[in-house]
Curated annotation (Swiss-Prot):
Keywords attached to this entry: Cytoplasm, Elongation factor, GTP-binding, Hydrolase, Magnesium, Metal-binding, Nucleotide-binding, Protein biosynthesis
Region annotation G4: where it falls in the sequence: 131-134
Organism annotation: Rhizobium radiobacter (Agrobacterium tumefaciens)
Matching CDD domains: EF_Tu, EFTU_II, EFTU_III
Function: GTP hydrolase that promotes the GTP-dependent binding of aminoacyl-tRNA to the A-site of ribosomes during protein biosynthesis.
Protein name: Elongation factor Tu
High-level lineage: Bacteria, Pseudomonadati, Pseudomonadota, Alphaproteobacteria, Hyphomicrobiales
Region (G3): 76-79
Length: 391
């Protein structure tokens, strides 16, 4: 079969399945592809290939499918550790998630942990699929499980009362055994995902931001900073701010070039050189950003959700304690920071995921959901995400 051209005629949304081990995440993923995509069997999805994100190896399965309204890229992870790593590194960014919970078991430890992770890494919306309803004969019991899931979501600041909960059986859908809880439930689920998970704002519509990778001085022209535009658009003649590491300063972009050609603007995804007025070669450095004035502030202190690599993954061999001082690699540069462990946490072991407070020695242009690597002497020992800014 010839590869069909990817049609960009529908909004694109990234989602994933989360939930406790053996509650049916992979079966549900397979069932969705059966009705909305190119069918992928359970074992095709379960044998997820390994990939690297921020120096960390993660197994993830990617499938795609579409509803009449949208095109979806869907990620499913085989193991619990892969979920933790995936959500923290943002290897597969999620605009929303389908929480799969077995009606027979109700919420379990990883159900709770995945909801907490979703909250910490800023997953905007969750839809619930209550799976294996054919294993529960008692309607009252089913209602209790639903109530329990709603309360759990609310306890992590998701709108538990309003979240759509669809009851069904992924297995019934795969085996065509009971249309009502099988195919009908899967179609109802995707209708809920279409309606409830918001379409993400495209990077190009967001305020301009470009991490600075390099600085050059061109005689007779001035200083050029290069990098890949992360979001938004920058037009020649526009005022921008240089943020991070040093006090924030303003400048004007007097030229944009790409592949040695002069352009009138650069936009999200472009690798550009921006000529900046009145900035000396040593007045700007790698690790700062160019951005729309006032859109991003520099910060030193933040709460982070982090995953610490195991020894086998090439990480530390020993635990660390409060006042641990590694480097935090933000966008294009390393900054030393001091880690404070939460009350009651004595130490952090390799393989743990943990919420910590970090204070950097210099401020970095920072906002919630910004990802970073934790490094020691250039070696990655962990990954993290800014959960909230302290100051």
């Amino acid at each position: 079969m010839a590869k069909s051209k990817f049609e960009r005629n529908k909004p694109h949304v990234n989602i994933g399945t989360i939930g406790h081990v053996d509650h049916g995440k992979t079966s549900l993923t397979a069932a969705i592809t059966k009705y909305f995509g190119e069918f992928k069997a359970y074992d095709q999805i379960d044998a997820a290939p390994e990939e690297k994100a921020r120096g960390i190896t993660i197994s993830t399965a990617h499938v795609e499918y579409e509803t009449p309204a949208r095109h979806y890229a869907h990620v499913d992870c085989p193991g619990h550790a892969d979920y933790v790593k995936n959500m923290i590194t943002g290897a597969a960014e999620m605009d929303g998630a389908i929480l799969v919970c077995s009606a027979a078991d109700g919420p379990m430890p990883q159900t709770r942990e995945h909801i907490l992770l979703a909250r910490q890494v800023g997953v905007p919306a969750i839809v619930v699929f209550l799976n294996k309803v054919d294993q529960v004969d008692d309607a009252e019991l089913l209602e209790l499980v639903e109530l329990e899931v709603r309360e759990l979501l609310s306890s992590y600041d998701f709108p538990g009362d309003d979240i759509p909960i669809i009851k069904g059986s992924a297995l019934a859908a795969l085996e065509d055994s009971d249309k009502k809880i099988g195919e009908d439930a899967i179609r109802e689920l995707m209708a809920a995902v279409d309606a409830y998970i918001p379409t993400p704002e495209r990077p190009i519509d967001q305020p301009f931001l470009m991490p600075i990778e390099d600085v050059f001085s061109i005689s007779g022209r001035g200083t050029v900073v290069t990098g890949r535009v992360e979001r938004g658009i920058v037009k020649v003649g526009e005022e921008v701010e240089i943020v991070g590491i040093r006090p924030t300063s303003k400048t004007t972009v007097t030229g944009v070039e790409m592949f040695r050609k002069l352009l009138d603007q650069g936009q999200a995804g472009d690798n550009i050189g921006a000529l900046v007025r009145g900035v000396t070669r040593d007045g700007v450095e790698r690790g700062q950003i160019l951005c729309k004035p006032g859109s991003v502030k520099p910060h030193k202190k933040f709460m982070a959700e982090a995953y610490i690599l195991t020894k086998e993954e090439g990480g530390r061999h020993t635990p660390f304690f409060t006042n641990y001082r590694p480097q935090f690699y933000f966008r294009t540069t390393d900054v030393t920071g001091i880690v404070s462990l939460p009350e009651g946490t004595e130490m952090v072991m390799p393989g743990d995921n943990v919420t910590v407070e970090v204070e950097l020695i210099v401020p970095i242009a920072m906002e919630e959901k910004l990802r970073f690597a934790i490094r020691e002497g250039g070696r990655t020992v962990g990954a993290g995400i800014v959960a909230s800014i302290v100051e």
